[in-house]
């Protein structure tokens, strides 16, 4: 696209796969979100090739974590697709293995967690997926998150900024604020210049995120364990892999408790704020309660009169 300004990283080009995890300059992107939200199709759009199996249906076809590579004008890019591990019903005996393998594929840690959600369809399941991402990767993960909306074509004449700004979905508004208003949209059926433009927008956000994080990637104790296992060669030492999965279980449980403590602390602060407001504005609060009860009584009487 001639009028499109290139980012620092340039444009995606196809090429042979490489183990770019070993390269210090490798950009690691981890796809997260609920099942069937379009993670695999988004990965294919980023790489501009059918690297991940993707079907147009509401159920996930990704059963295990999968890593594929591409380049962005000389810089290697690793894209990791994930199985259904970010939802409450995903708790099963293979959960530890799925999470552990995901850590191994994007060790020493992702620069970007790309939360994929369908435009206009941010549901309670999506909100649960966000919470599960925090449980799996730690409460600090939002610092490295970008929200990517699929079905960009549904915007029609409306801009994405307008959609996000005027949405009445409180959970979505809270999410975009929490991740620093880093979001973009993809039409995963796009090709040519349209696809190129989408990629340029995403990479501009990636560049902004890396500047904000001073080039750092998301890491925690479990990523350190994953790196140690990779150095040992876990394919040969199965006992080391079993010990690693035990650490996965322990660390995820620890991160879950930390998240609950953080949420509990926030609720406690809100209660203290309400109490403070009540004690200093007792008369005003009492008046609001009386007015509320009056309006409720009037509404009930109106409903009764209409039913007669």
Swiss-Prot record:
The keyword Transmembrane helix applies. Residues 24-227 form the AIG1-type G domain. It comes from the Eukaryota. Expressed in thymus (in thymocytes), spleen (in splenocytes), lymph node and lung. Highly expressed in T lymphocytes. Expressed in B cells and in distinct lineages of hematopoietic bone marrow cells, including natural killer, B, T, myeloid and erythroid lineages. Expressed in liver endothelial cells. It is found in: Lysosome; Lysosome membrane; Endosome, Multivesicular body membrane; Endosome membrane. It is a single-pass type IV membrane protein. GO terms for molecular function: GTP binding. GTP binds at residues 33-41, 54, 151-153, 188. Keywords: Endosome, GTP-binding, Lysosome, Membrane, Nucleotide-binding, Transmembrane, Transmembrane helix. Residues 305-308 are mitochondrial intermembrane. Residues 1-283 are cytoplasmic. Coiled coil: none annotated. Its main location: other. Disruption phenotype: Knockout mice are born at the expected Mendelian rate, with a normal sex ratio, but have a median survival of only 15 weeks. They exhibit chronic hepatic hematopoiesis and, in later stages, show pronounced hepatocyte apoptosis, leading to lethal liver failure. Loss of GIMAP5 function impairs peripheral T-cell survival, imposes a complete block of natural killer (NK) and NK T-cell development. Mutant mice show progressive multilineage failure of bone marrow and hematopoiesis. One of its GO terms (cellular component) is multivesicular body membrane. The chain crosses the membrane at residues 284-304. Pfam families: AIG1 (PF04548). Plays a role in T lymphocyte development and the optimal generation of CD4/CD8 double-positive thymocytes. Inhibitor of GSK3A. May act by sequestering GSK3A in cytoplasmic vesicles and impairing its translocation to the nucleus. Consequently, impairs GSK3A-dependent transcriptional program and regulation of the DNA damage response occurring during T cells proliferation. Required for the survival of bone marrow hematopoietic stem cells, as well as of peripheral T cells, natural killer (NK) and NK T-cell development and the maintenance of normal liver function. Belongs to the TRAFAC class TrmE-Era-EngA-EngB-Septin-like GTPase superfamily. AIG1/Toc34/Toc159-like paraseptin GTPase family. IAN subfamily. Interacts with BAD, BAK1, BAX, BCL2, BCL2L1/Bcl-xL and BCL2L11/BimEL. The interaction with BAX is increased, when cells initiate apoptosis upon IL2 withdrawal. Forms a complex with BCL2L1 or MCL1 and HSPA8/HSC70; the interaction between HSPA8 and BCL2L1 or MCL1 is impaired in the absence of GIMAP5. May interact (via N-terminus) with microtubules. This is GTPase IMAP family member 5. It comes from Mus musculus (Mouse).
């Amino acid at each position: 696209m001639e009028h499109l300004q290139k980012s620092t990283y340039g444009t995606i080009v196809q090429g042979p796969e490489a183990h770019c995890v070993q390269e210090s300059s490798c950009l690691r992107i981890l796809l997260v979100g609920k099942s069937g939200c379009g993670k695999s199709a988004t990965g294919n759009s980023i790489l501009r090739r059918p690297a991940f199996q993707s079907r147009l249906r509401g159920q996930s076809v990704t059963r295990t974590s999968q890593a594929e590579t591409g380049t962005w004008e000389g810089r290697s890019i690793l894209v990791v697709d994930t199985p259904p591990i970010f939802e409450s019903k995903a708790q099963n005996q293979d959960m530890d293995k799925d999470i552990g393998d995901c850590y191994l594929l994007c060790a020493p840690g992702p620069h970007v967690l790309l939360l994929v959600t369908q435009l206009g369809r941010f549901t309670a399941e999506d909100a649960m997926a966000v919470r599960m991402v925090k449980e799996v990767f730690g409460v600090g993960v939002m610092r490295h998150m970008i929200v990517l909306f699929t079905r960009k074509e549904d915007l029609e004449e409306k801009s994405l900024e307008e959609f996000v700004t005027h949405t009445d979905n409180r959970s979505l508004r809270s999410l975009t604020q929490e991740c620093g208003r880093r979001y973009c949209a993809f039409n995963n059926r796009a090709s040519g210049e349209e696809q190129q433009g989408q990629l340029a927008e995403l990479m501009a956000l990636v560049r902004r995120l890396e500047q904000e994080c001073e080039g750092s990637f998301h890491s925690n104790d479990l990523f350190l364990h994953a790196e140690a296992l990779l150095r040992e060669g876990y394919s040969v030492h199965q006992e080391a892999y079993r010990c690693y999965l035990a650490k996965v279980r322990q660390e995820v449980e620890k991160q879950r408790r930390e998240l609950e403590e953080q949420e509990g602390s926030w609720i406690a602060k809100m209660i203290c704020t309400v109490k403070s407001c009540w004690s200093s504005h007792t008369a005003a609060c009492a008046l609001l309660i009386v007015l509320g009860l009056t309006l409720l009584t009037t509404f009930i009487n109106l409903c009764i009169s209409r039913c007669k």
